[in-house]
Amino acid sequence: MKENIKPKQLDMLHGSIWNKLPLFAFPVAATAILEQLFNASDVAIVGNFTGAGKTIAVAAVGANSFIIALLVNLFVGIALGANVVIANAIGRKDQETVRKAVHTSIVVAVLAGFFISVIGEILADPVLTLVHVPEDVFSEALLYLRIYLLGMPVILLYNFEAAIFRSTGDTKTPLVVLTVAGVLNVLLNLFFVAVLHMTVNGVAIATVVSNAVSSILLLRRLIKTEEWTHVELKELRIDRIIFEQIIKIGLPAGIQSAVFALANVVIQSAINSLGTVVMAASSAAFNIEVFAYDVLNSFSQACTTFVGQNYGAGQIRRCRKVLILCIVEDTLATACAVVLILVFGKQLLSIFNNDPQVVSLGYTRILMVFSAYTFSMLYENMSGYMRGFGISLMPAVLTTLGICGVRVLWIVCVFPRYRTFTGILTAYPVSLCVTAILIFIALFHYKPSKKVQINNI
């Protein structure tokens, strides 16, 4: 295997940082946006090709958005643990740890995917009942969720594989692979729904097939590479020590991401109580606003990976520079994305559903959510910075308090008095503001950059 960094990989340990952060972050953002397009194309196509039942079909897909996010985010966070372990080992030039972490990650992804599929199929019905999916939407929502859950092994495998590539600085390969899968997803959606006249079952099948293709392509690339991340099928096993390191960092990060989604499930339950039109509006808006969030979050991932490698190499001052530059560049990039969406928001909403009431309510949601993005950007980057040092539990705990705690309290205590869509959405800026303050206080007092460098996280 080659010890030197490939030309397509970023050298995070030497040279200027400011110009390398966008080179890492933008492909990550583009990849995340394509992943969102899997679900967005589902919503858009069922909203335009299912005739009189389009509102029910859109609401059925939307009712699952936060449930799916809860599951996927948990294991994407654990995959981030693999990212940090591998990045730290690369910084230390520890090839053996890189090899063990790569093989452990792949096995964990597949086994966890099968576990979620089995448990998810058992709990799908009661979970949809728990979040108060309306009776007229329930059967379609359940059908979509059951099919989607069958694809969890390949969905998780792709996300762990992408984390492996990103830990080396290669963010372009996951983007290229997902571009191919994304185009396939849209074509399959059109074929199943417009040609075969299927409904949510067609778009769910298309999403699973597309994710299978992306995971297989990335696995093939890992098998063929001669770099440290080379995969040897006969070596696929879980290394206990590496697994513990991944879980130590990744599980709190996964809980942090899952808590975000869990809080949104609570909010979705309140939204469901306002009827099908509000559900459809919220679903359409979510599939648009999340594109700006993907830009925002990409710099947080860059912060984690850059800090992880530099921490492994003992370059602590460089770690601090990474945080400052991530906040500055993230602010500029996210602001551009937000402005574009605000300008074209109503036109974008009409792609999903051209009902005037749905468009109006959807745009209201976009405005309310974007009002909180300054707080979101700050807490995401500060959390990413701490994770790069292997500090993952504290951000997870504070996020649970700030996001999940505040939003649940809001829905329980405030929403019953102000039973409106705006009354629900106000929970977003309030909870994100509280979380940003908590993370800042923790960062100021904990001072992770003052930690003494250790051999392993």
Descriptions of predicted regions:
Residues I33, L37-A59, L128-E135, F191-M198, ...:
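Helix-terminus/linker motif at the lipid-water interface of multi-pass membrane proteins
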